[in-house]
Regions:
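A short glycine-rich, Lys/Arg-flanked "PGG" loop and its adjoining helix->strand segment in the class I
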Residues: 125-137
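Conserved beta-strand signature within the Rossmann-like core of class I S-adenosyl-L-methionine
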Residues: 138-145
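SAM-dependent methyltransferase
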Residues: 145-211
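A conserved beta-strand element that flanks and buttresses the S-adenosyl-L-methionine
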Residues: 111
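Class I SAM-dependent methyltransferase SAM/SAH-binding core
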Residues: 49-50, 55-100
Length: 243
Protein backbone atom coordinates (compact mmCIF):
# COMPACT_ATOMS: atom_id res chain seq x y z
CA UNK A 1 0.00 0.00 0.00
CA UNK A 2 1.35 3.43 -0.96
CA UNK A 3 0.70 6.35 1.40
CA UNK A 4 0.21 9.28 -0.98
CA UNK A 5 -0.47 11.93 1.62
CA UNK A 6 1.69 11.72 4.76
CA UNK A 7 4.42 13.97 3.32
CA UNK A 8 2.02 16.90 2.96
CA UNK A 9 -0.70 15.89 5.44
CA UNK A 10 -0.05 18.92 7.67
CA UNK A 11 -1.38 21.16 4.88
CA UNK A 12 -4.29 19.01 3.74
CA UNK A 13 -7.00 20.77 5.70
CA UNK A 14 -6.31 23.99 3.79
CA UNK A 15 -7.24 22.23 0.55
CA UNK A 16 -10.02 20.12 2.05
CA UNK A 17 -11.89 23.13 3.41
CA UNK A 18 -12.06 24.77 -0.02
CA UNK A 19 -12.72 21.47 -1.76
CA UNK A 20 -15.70 20.63 0.41
CA UNK A 21 -17.19 24.08 -0.02
CA UNK A 22 -17.43 23.47 -3.78
CA UNK A 23 -17.97 19.70 -3.96
CA UNK A 24 -20.18 19.29 -0.90
CA UNK A 25 -23.41 20.73 -2.37
CA UNK A 26 -23.50 18.51 -5.49
CA UNK A 27 -22.58 15.45 -3.43
CA UNK A 28 -25.40 16.23 -1.01
CA UNK A 29 -27.88 16.58 -3.87
CA UNK A 30 -26.96 13.14 -5.22
CA UNK A 31 -27.13 11.43 -1.84
CA UNK A 32 -30.37 12.89 -0.50
CA UNK A 33 -32.54 10.45 -2.43
CA UNK A 34 -30.61 7.33 -1.40
CA UNK A 35 -32.48 4.59 0.44
CA UNK A 36 -30.10 3.68 3.28
CA UNK A 37 -32.07 0.65 4.48
CA UNK A 38 -30.00 -1.73 2.33
CA UNK A 39 -26.78 -1.27 4.30
CA UNK A 40 -24.04 1.20 5.21
CA UNK A 41 -22.79 4.00 2.99
CA UNK A 42 -19.13 3.39 2.13
CA UNK A 43 -16.63 6.21 1.68
CA UNK A 44 -13.36 5.07 0.11
CA UNK A 45 -10.54 7.50 0.85
CA UNK A 46 -11.97 9.54 3.72
CA UNK A 47 -9.01 11.89 4.11
CA UNK A 48 -9.48 14.11 7.14
CA UNK A 49 -13.25 13.62 7.25
CA UNK A 50 -14.59 16.72 5.52
CA UNK A 51 -16.54 14.70 2.94
CA UNK A 52 -17.62 12.32 5.70
CA UNK A 53 -19.39 15.24 7.35
CA UNK A 54 -21.19 16.02 4.08
CA UNK A 55 -22.36 12.41 3.75
CA UNK A 56 -23.58 12.34 7.35
CA UNK A 57 -25.49 15.60 6.93
CA UNK A 58 -27.14 14.49 3.67
CA UNK A 59 -28.10 11.08 5.11
CA UNK A 60 -28.84 11.65 8.81
CA UNK A 61 -29.99 8.06 9.42
CA UNK A 62 -27.20 6.28 7.56
CA UNK A 63 -24.49 4.11 9.00
CA UNK A 64 -21.20 5.13 7.36
CA UNK A 65 -18.00 3.15 6.88
CA UNK A 66 -14.96 5.28 6.02
CA UNK A 67 -11.74 3.70 4.73
CA UNK A 68 -8.52 5.74 4.84
CA UNK A 69 -5.17 3.97 4.34
CA UNK A 70 -2.92 6.89 5.35
CA UNK A 71 -2.24 6.74 9.10
CA UNK A 72 -1.59 10.49 9.28
CA UNK A 73 -4.81 11.38 7.51
CA UNK A 74 -6.71 8.75 9.46
CA UNK A 75 -5.60 10.33 12.74
CA UNK A 76 -7.27 13.60 11.73
CA UNK A 77 -10.33 11.73 10.45
CA UNK A 78 -10.74 9.80 13.69
CA UNK A 79 -10.31 12.98 15.72
CA UNK A 80 -13.07 14.68 13.72
CA UNK A 81 -15.41 11.73 14.17
CA UNK A 82 -14.63 11.30 17.87
CA UNK A 83 -15.48 14.87 18.83
CA UNK A 84 -18.90 14.88 17.13
CA UNK A 85 -21.50 12.81 19.03
CA UNK A 86 -23.55 12.09 15.89
CA UNK A 87 -20.55 11.02 13.81
CA UNK A 88 -19.20 9.00 16.71
CA UNK A 89 -22.44 7.01 16.82
CA UNK A 90 -22.71 6.35 13.07
CA UNK A 91 -19.23 6.36 11.53
CA UNK A 92 -16.77 3.46 11.56
CA UNK A 93 -13.20 4.31 10.50
CA UNK A 94 -11.06 1.59 8.91
CA UNK A 95 -7.53 1.50 7.51
CA UNK A 96 -8.32 -0.31 4.27
CA UNK A 97 -7.07 0.60 0.80
CA UNK A 98 -9.39 0.40 -2.20
CA UNK A 99 -7.56 -2.50 -3.83
CA UNK A 100 -8.10 -4.97 -0.96
CA UNK A 101 -10.75 -3.29 1.16
CA UNK A 102 -12.89 -5.66 3.28
CA UNK A 103 -16.53 -4.97 2.44
CA UNK A 104 -19.79 -5.64 4.28
CA UNK A 105 -22.31 -7.97 2.67
CA UNK A 106 -24.57 -5.08 1.57
CA UNK A 107 -24.17 -1.36 0.83
CA UNK A 108 -26.57 1.49 0.11
CA UNK A 109 -24.15 3.84 -1.71
CA UNK A 110 -20.45 4.47 -2.27
CA UNK A 111 -18.48 7.74 -2.36
CA UNK A 112 -14.95 7.95 -3.84
CA UNK A 113 -13.35 11.40 -3.88
CA UNK A 114 -9.70 11.77 -4.89
CA UNK A 115 -9.21 8.01 -5.20
CA UNK A 116 -10.13 6.48 -8.58
CA UNK A 117 -7.01 7.70 -10.40
CA UNK A 118 -4.72 6.09 -7.83
CA UNK A 119 -6.02 2.76 -9.17
CA UNK A 120 -5.09 1.17 -12.47
CA UNK A 121 -7.94 0.29 -14.82
CA UNK A 122 -7.81 -3.44 -13.88
CA UNK A 123 -7.87 -2.51 -10.18
CA UNK A 124 -10.90 -0.30 -10.76
CA UNK A 125 -12.72 -3.02 -12.71
CA UNK A 126 -12.18 -5.45 -9.83
CA UNK A 127 -13.44 -2.86 -7.34
CA UNK A 128 -16.57 -2.03 -9.39
CA UNK A 129 -17.40 -5.75 -9.55
CA UNK A 130 -17.12 -6.14 -5.77
CA UNK A 131 -19.20 -3.02 -5.12
CA UNK A 132 -21.90 -3.95 -7.64
CA UNK A 133 -22.39 -7.30 -5.92
CA UNK A 134 -23.31 -5.44 -2.71
CA UNK A 135 -25.39 -2.54 -4.03
CA UNK A 136 -29.12 -2.67 -4.85
CA UNK A 137 -30.39 -1.63 -8.27
CA UNK A 138 -30.44 2.15 -8.57
CA UNK A 139 -27.80 2.75 -5.90
CA UNK A 140 -25.07 5.29 -6.76
CA UNK A 141 -21.30 5.19 -6.75
CA UNK A 142 -20.28 8.86 -6.60
CA UNK A 143 -16.81 9.54 -8.01
CA UNK A 144 -14.85 12.78 -8.15
CA UNK A 145 -13.69 13.22 -11.76
CA UNK A 146 -10.73 15.54 -11.02
CA UNK A 147 -10.97 17.30 -14.40
CA UNK A 148 -8.22 15.31 -16.15
CA UNK A 149 -9.71 12.86 -18.66
CA UNK A 150 -6.49 12.12 -20.58
CA UNK A 151 -2.76 12.72 -20.03
CA UNK A 152 -1.51 16.22 -20.79
CA UNK A 153 1.12 18.68 -19.67
CA UNK A 154 -0.07 20.93 -16.85
CA UNK A 155 2.52 23.65 -16.09
CA UNK A 156 3.02 24.30 -12.36
CA UNK A 157 0.40 26.73 -11.10
CA UNK A 158 -0.40 28.13 -7.68
CA UNK A 159 -3.74 26.55 -6.76
CA UNK A 160 -4.14 27.93 -3.25
CA UNK A 161 -2.78 30.72 -1.06
CA UNK A 162 -3.82 31.05 2.59
CA UNK A 163 -2.46 32.96 5.57
CA UNK A 164 -2.37 31.53 9.09
CA UNK A 165 -0.81 33.68 11.78
CA UNK A 166 2.45 35.14 10.51
CA UNK A 167 2.87 32.64 7.70
CA UNK A 168 1.39 32.31 4.22
CA UNK A 169 0.97 28.92 2.59
CA UNK A 170 1.09 28.42 -1.18
CA UNK A 171 0.14 25.19 -2.92
CA UNK A 172 1.66 24.63 -6.37
CA UNK A 173 0.68 21.73 -8.60
CA UNK A 174 1.69 20.57 -12.07
CA UNK A 175 1.67 17.37 -14.08
CA UNK A 176 3.01 15.60 -17.14
CA UNK A 177 2.20 12.40 -19.04
CA UNK A 178 4.12 9.23 -18.21
CA UNK A 179 2.94 5.95 -19.78
CA UNK A 180 -0.44 4.95 -21.17
CA UNK A 181 -3.28 6.67 -19.31
CA UNK A 182 -1.02 7.86 -16.48
CA UNK A 183 0.27 11.25 -15.40
CA UNK A 184 2.76 12.18 -12.72
CA UNK A 185 1.59 15.09 -10.62
CA UNK A 186 4.07 17.09 -8.55
CA UNK A 187 2.88 19.24 -5.68
CA UNK A 188 4.86 21.77 -3.68
CA UNK A 189 3.84 23.59 -0.53
CA UNK A 190 5.70 26.83 0.16
CA UNK A 191 5.65 28.40 3.61
CA UNK A 192 6.46 32.11 3.56
CA UNK A 193 7.02 34.69 6.29
CA UNK A 194 5.42 38.13 6.31
CA UNK A 195 8.36 39.59 4.39
CA UNK A 196 7.85 37.06 1.58
CA UNK A 197 10.85 34.95 2.53
CA UNK A 198 10.36 31.24 1.91
CA UNK A 199 11.17 29.38 5.11
CA UNK A 200 10.16 25.90 4.03
CA UNK A 201 9.14 23.88 0.97
CA UNK A 202 7.56 20.43 0.96
CA UNK A 203 7.30 18.60 -2.37
CA UNK A 204 5.75 15.29 -3.32
CA UNK A 205 4.66 13.45 -6.46
CA UNK A 206 2.27 10.68 -7.36
CA UNK A 207 1.00 8.80 -10.42
CA UNK A 208 -2.61 9.39 -11.47
CA UNK A 209 -4.43 7.21 -14.03
CA UNK A 210 -6.69 9.53 -16.02
CA UNK A 211 -10.32 8.76 -16.83
CA UNK A 212 -13.71 10.27 -17.59
CA UNK A 213 -17.13 9.19 -16.41
CA UNK A 214 -17.88 7.30 -19.64
CA UNK A 215 -14.78 5.18 -19.15
CA UNK A 216 -15.71 4.43 -15.55
CA UNK A 217 -19.23 3.45 -16.61
CA UNK A 218 -17.85 1.09 -19.25
CA UNK A 219 -15.50 -0.48 -16.71
CA UNK A 220 -18.33 -0.96 -14.22
CA UNK A 221 -21.07 -1.94 -16.68
CA UNK A 222 -23.28 0.76 -15.21
CA UNK A 223 -25.11 3.83 -16.43
CA UNK A 224 -23.61 7.22 -15.61
CA UNK A 225 -24.16 10.94 -15.47
CA UNK A 226 -22.04 13.99 -14.74
CA UNK A 227 -22.83 16.65 -12.17
CA UNK A 228 -21.37 20.00 -13.20
CA UNK A 229 -23.49 22.48 -11.24
CA UNK A 230 -25.41 22.79 -8.00
CA UNK A 231 -27.86 25.53 -7.17
CA UNK A 232 -27.11 27.20 -10.49
CA UNK A 233 -23.37 27.41 -9.73
CA UNK A 234 -20.59 25.60 -11.58
CA UNK A 235 -18.88 23.00 -9.40
CA UNK A 236 -15.99 20.53 -9.80
CA UNK A 237 -17.14 17.61 -11.94
CA UNK A 238 -18.63 14.62 -10.17
CA UNK A 239 -19.52 11.36 -11.87
CA UNK A 240 -22.41 9.21 -10.71
CA UNK A 241 -22.39 5.52 -11.64
CA UNK A 242 -25.74 3.80 -11.17
CA UNK A 243 -26.17 0.06 -10.98
Amino acid sequence: MIDYYSTSAEFYELVATRHTASSGPPLSSVLRGVDTSHGPVLEIGGGTGRVTEVIASALPQAEIIVAEPSATMRAMLTSRVARDPDLRRRVTVTDGAAQDLPLPDTLSAVVMFGVAGHLTAPERVALWKRLAARLPDGAPIVVELMGVSSPRVIPPVMSLRETIGRQTYEWWIGGEPTEGDAMRFTTTWKVLREDGRTVREVSDSYVWHTFDVARLAAEAGMTSRRITEAGGRAVPEIGVLVK
